Amino acid sequence: SMLYAIGIACVKYSKFSYLNTLFHLMLPEYSSPDSSGRIYFLNKLHPCYWDKDDLNQLNGTNYKTPLSTILSKQLRPYFQKEIFLESEYISTFCIFEYLLSLNFKHIGGLSYAPDWAPWGEFRWRTMIFMRGNNDLYSTFFAQAESQKNNWEPIKQGMFDGKYEVYKKLKTKIQTSTSTAH
């Protein structure tokens, strides 16, 4: 939950360079000078790391994204003073998870499942966001399309500071999450 707490705060306060650094952390025991054994933190900790059915069974729930939903509910009280509206919190949470998914794909993903990327609440909430109007989530990612290399996450170094890298990753993520079960 620490990853998520830091991530939500980074999104809320537009600290994307910090978030980028967090996403690129490596596990020390796997670090090697020639980068052949590089294992990124995100490869071991993401919202799909644990089996959905096992988590639901343990918690007596039937969530589409159990870890994401549990973390969202668990962390909400800590952001009450900074994020007043529930809708803003949910949007901020989903922005973080989508950025996590994009960055997971960007740093290399899983060698044995190159087309896969983790997904969270953003996967099923996107349709809800699209039906509403003036929501933070849709606006945030629409800014990428209009601002391109001037979009704040890109300006702060995410996606190698290039809109084209982001756009390719976004297409890959949309493909992988639309075919995920």
Regions found by a protein language model. Give the residues of each.
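Charge-rich interaction segments
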Residues: 1-7
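Charge-dense, extended regions
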Residues: 18-181
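Short coil/turn connectors between adjacent alpha-helices in alpha-solenoid helical repeat scaffolds
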Residues: 7-17, 58
